[in-house]
Amino acid sequence: SMNTQPPPNGRHDTQAAWPVMILAHNEEKHIVACLDSLFSAEPGRRFEIFVMANGCTDGTETVVNEYSRAHDGVNLISIPLGDKNNAWNVFVHDVVPLRVPDREIYFFMDGDARACRGALTEMANGLRENPYAHAASALPTSGRSMGRDRAEMLKDRGLVANLYSLRGNFVKELIRKKVRLPLKLEGDDGLLGALIKWDLDPGKPWDMNRIVPCPKAGFTFESFPWTSPSHWSAYWRRMVRYGRRKYEFELLGKKLKSEGIGALPADITELYPQSSTLKLRWAGIHTITNWVALQEMRRFCK
């Protein structure tokens, strides 16, 4: 007779645990909510979560260690260098082959984001239903510009660092081709999205169908309250970073198109000497922060 007993605590142990990378740099205030959100988004799922604590000078590591005692499958990976790109590289090239090789799907998340109910299942289904796609992305369900951001991501078939997934075979290719994100790069998700659409060959035109945005897969994050001066300065810095992101990508795009994926610099600042060729473009109010970004990139070389 067949054993029709439900598995203990609702788990289907035949399913491989889902690997999740979480980037965390000084996230002691948000990391528990982030981790909690995964478990409540996918009740009954087993996870293999790796919190990539990079350059933390706060209590992030202590918080994660305590959390891992009470929750199966939560692992702290402690990295001295505070750089999100380096932490991503460590996950893909060191953690995956050793700890979670040959999985069908890998999830990636920021330590200050929260996954909405069913978000990971939606992305897994997105990849299953679109065998041609290398990646499935979640969309924001909060934030001031949420409506615009969602529309843009659906139109451009975009991916943002807050929450996305990569097909296992694509991760294998990243490992095989030794693809590493440049250190100090601002737009890690922008570059990754481009590499996915290029199918790791920047000589080819972009193929938008390589990314599946999943409207039912959502994430939330804390917005800046507009009340205190410290938030204004944080917002200003964020706008400068957005400016830098565009300029870095301009330098990188040119180089990759002409020299191929092997031309990815180990550190994005290697390309800063060419920032003298970049032109300041009018962008309304953001022209000012763009100008600041450009000055900083040029000053870096002096």
Residue ranges and their predicted role:
Residues 13, 36-46:
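Short, acidic, metal-binding catalytic loop of nucleotide-sugar glycosyltransferases
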Residues 100-114:
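Short beta-strand-to-loop acidic/aromatic patch adjacent to the donor-nucleotide binding site
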